[in-house]
Amino acid sequence: MYKRQDGTILHVAVTLRDHPIPIIGVNFGGKGFLAGLEDDELDMLLEIADGQYTVSRRMMLDVELVRNERIICTQSVLNDVVIHGGHVDCIGVTAYGDGVPITRFNGDGIIVATPTGSTAYSMSAGGPLVEPENENIIMTPICAHSLAGKSFVLAPGRQITIVPERIHDRPAILVADGGDSIALIRGDQIRIRRSDNYTLLADTGIRSFYETAFGKLTDRL
């Protein structure tokens, strides 16, 4: 599968979530953390077609939007869920783990990511990099206005509930894996938990996660 952005793989991952089929991406531009091959490594596709690869199993998240005690939307993600105030608005965010408050802050929003998604928006917002085959839930604030807005790396079994607050004239926004925006209103809750499904990525063994991160994130001296 050829790709220009990781969004292509994210779309395929959700499409195949009920089917254990390994995915391989070829990066033709950009950071391309999910791509197993670069555009000058196309000859490796023949070896992959011959079964010369290992499988990297990646955790996914299931997301539920709850409104007036009813689930009105469900999605699965490989990378992340983003709740934000739109282009201009600051919102309040309260996050719960298994019903217990974890953090509350005002800011632009919050990202809830998988280890695979730790190299995406969460990283840009100052979140930690987590080895992609680990199973953790990563919460990263977006431009928090207080010291309470810190990143958390949580156990995979936690059920996370995000409650956006201070929603006034404009709705807050929910985005799952960079897809379509969903408007949030006062009183909405977003419930997030580890999915029973996994994404399988074909791993050629050409480079490790650390080599990929170093090559894509380090400036040339």
What residues fall within each predicted segment?
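Conserved small/polar residues in nucleotide/adenosyl-binding loops
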Residues: 1-2
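Short glycine-rich anion-binding loops that position phosphate/pyrophosphate groups of nucleotides
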Residues: 5-8, 31, 116-118
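Gly/Ser-rich helix-loop-strand patches that form or flank binding pockets
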Residues: 11, 15-28
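A glycine- and small-aliphatic-rich helix-loop capping segment at beta-alpha/alpha-beta transitions
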Residues: 16-21, 39-44, 126-135
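Catalytic core of DAGKc-family lipid kinases
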Residues: 30-108
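ATP/nucleoside-binding phosphotransfer catalytic cores, i.e., glycine-rich phosphate-binding loops
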Residues: 83-84, 88, 98-101, 150-221
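Gly/Ser/Thr-rich active-site loops/lids in small-molecule metabolic enzymes
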Residues: 104-148
